[in-house]
């Protein structure tokens, strides 16, 4: 990348505040004509980084509005270019007139996310930080906002960059052993590279775990309530959402489709999904509901297998329902929930150290529901203090997984054959995968997809 702005010919403009009426509306401009536009609209260019109050003029020198103007000369601005902000009254008509005035003077309308894209291309922030801006805007809880802010401040990027530096150092030793085989010290044979590779793999695992939690905090964990008809699945959904989200009756097969609710538990986002009772049925509509239930179960982050505690004392899912367990793609994501303990006489004591964990509750009375909430927080890795965490996306997890696979291959090569050339290739693959996170190696179409999801004016 270059330290000088890449966009030298055009200046972009956009309304940076949300649509509708408001006390203040902001027009943002970035590009080489920003200073000239300031002089044409304000009559002069404000002193850099000083707020100036005054009128905004149209082409006939008539006052369109009055407000505050701020000028940030590049490269010391958000985008790295000359930036002008016009803060006027937040009515749609005023904002449209001001924006039209900017366009008439030569600015063009910005694409969604183009300001952040220019900041990225001009080395003002990396790709993970740019994505964190959108995550901060979209945050649905305080914890998610705090994670996004840490990513914006560089927490995620710093950890990824440290990993890349380790891989570069590893490549130096490996390629030295390949290029200079006559040297007395063989880094591949003396264990130094193996130790460094193992350390890099462990560090990558730590970053991957933190990123996984960050992605869950950003996107929310998918929790699917599954079980036979009349086990109390809809009642549990209502208990978790604390409202009548689903119809509850004693008639089997009342729920025939997937019901989704988005909730927070102490700031932790959850997508709770109620499903049709699982059974063989001749009813064509109910069959569709059962098929959809299995679709949700198979992609869930957590499956709550709800059992009517009045019908069985069994707590082993393999004994209760071996066909269900056998079909699960991730049995380790299962929690057994024994419902209706108000009728069975069981206590609300949970057995969370068993496999799978067991939670006892009454969805009808609410007894034990708080224990289930705490269990969900625990399996998600959520706690009140989110220090050291950061926001992450699915594409970041994919890149980390590919880097991990490459390191695994490298370790196998080293242990099996000591093949330096193959190890060097694996290290390059891992480095490139990690560099995609910060944007050092990123395809143009991916950049377009990422920044295209931003707000206009960001």
From Swiss-Prot:
UniProt-annotated binding residues for Mg(2+): 234, 255
Q: What is its EC number?
A: 3.6.-.-
Molecular-function GO term, any one: GTP binding
Q: SUPFAM superfamilies, alphabetically?
A: P-loop containing nucleoside triphosphate hydrolases (SSF52540), TrmE connector domain (SSF116878)
How is the cofactor bound, as the UniProt entry phrases it? Answer: Binds 1 potassium ion per subunit.
Instruction: Keywords in alphabetical order, please.
Output: Cytoplasm, GTP-binding, Hydrolase, Magnesium, Metal-binding, Nucleotide-binding, Potassium, tRNA processing
Q: Quote the subunit structure annotation.
A: Homodimer. Heterotetramer of two MnmE and two MnmG subunits.
User: What function is annotated for this protein?
Assistant: Exhibits a very high intrinsic GTPase hydrolysis rate. Involved in the addition of a carboxymethylaminomethyl (cmnm) group at the wobble position (U34) of certain tRNAs, forming tRNA-cmnm(5)s(2)U34.
Q: Which family does it belong to?
A: Belongs to the TRAFAC class TrmE-Era-EngA-EngB-Septin-like GTPase superfamily. TrmE GTPase family.
Protein known as: tRNA modification GTPase MnmE
Coding gene? mnmE
């Amino acid at each position: 990348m270059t330290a000088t702005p890449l966009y030298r010919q055009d200046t972009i403009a956009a309304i940076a505040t949300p649509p509708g009426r408001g006390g203040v509306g902001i027009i943002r401009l970035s590009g080489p004509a920003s200073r000239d536009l300031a002089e044409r609209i304000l009559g002069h260019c404000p002193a850099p980084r000083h707020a100036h109050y005054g009128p905004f003029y149209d082409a006939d020198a008539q006052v369109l509005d009055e407000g505050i103007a701020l000028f940030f000369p590049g490269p010391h601005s958000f985008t790295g270019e000359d930036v002008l902000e016009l803060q006027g009254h937040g009515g749609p008509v005023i904002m449209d007139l001001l924006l039209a005035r900017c366009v008439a003077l030569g600015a063009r309308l910005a694409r969604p996310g183009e300001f952040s894209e220019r900041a990225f291309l001009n080395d003002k922030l990396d790709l993970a930080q740019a994505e964190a801006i959108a995550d901060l805007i979209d945050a649905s809880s305080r914890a998610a906002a705090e994670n996004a802010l840490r990513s914006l401040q560089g927490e995620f990027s710093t950890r990824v960059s440290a990993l890349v530096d380790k891989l570069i150092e590893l490549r130096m030793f490996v390629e030295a052993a390949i290029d200079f085989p006559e040297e007395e010290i063989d880094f591949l044979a003396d264990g130094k590279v193996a130790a460094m590779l193992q350390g890099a793999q462990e560090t990558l695992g730590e970053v991957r775990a933190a990123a996984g939690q960050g992605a869950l905090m950003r996107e929310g964990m998918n929790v699917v309530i599954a079980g036979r008809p009349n086990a109390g699945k809809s009642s549990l959904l209502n208990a978790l959402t604390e409202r009548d989200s689903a119809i509850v009756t004693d008639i089997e097969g009342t729920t025939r489709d997937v019901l989704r609710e988005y909730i927070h538990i102490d700031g932790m986002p959850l997508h709770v999904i109620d499903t049709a009772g699982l059974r063989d049925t001749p009813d064509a509509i109910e069959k569709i509901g059962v098929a959809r239930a299995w679709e949700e179960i198979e992609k869930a982050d957590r499956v709550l297998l709800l059992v009517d505690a009045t019908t069985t004392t069994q707590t082993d899912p393999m004994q209760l329902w071996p066909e269900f367990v056998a079909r699960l793609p991730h049995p380790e994501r299962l929690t057994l929930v024994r419902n209706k303990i108000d009728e069975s006489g069981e206590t609300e004591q949970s057995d969370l150290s068993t496999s799978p964990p067991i939670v006892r509750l009454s969805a009808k009375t609410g007894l034990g529901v708080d224990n289930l909430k705490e269990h969900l927080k625990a399996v998600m890795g959520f706690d009140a203090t989110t220090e050291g965490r950061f926001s992450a996306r699915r594409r970041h997890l994919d890149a980390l997984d590919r880097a991990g696979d490459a390191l695994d291959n490298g370790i196998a090569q080293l242990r099996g054959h000591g093949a330096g050339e193959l190890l060097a290739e694996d290290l390059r693959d891992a480095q490139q995968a990690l560099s995609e996170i910060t944007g050092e190696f990123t395809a143009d179409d991916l950049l377009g997809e990422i920044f295209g999801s931003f707000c206009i004016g960001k």
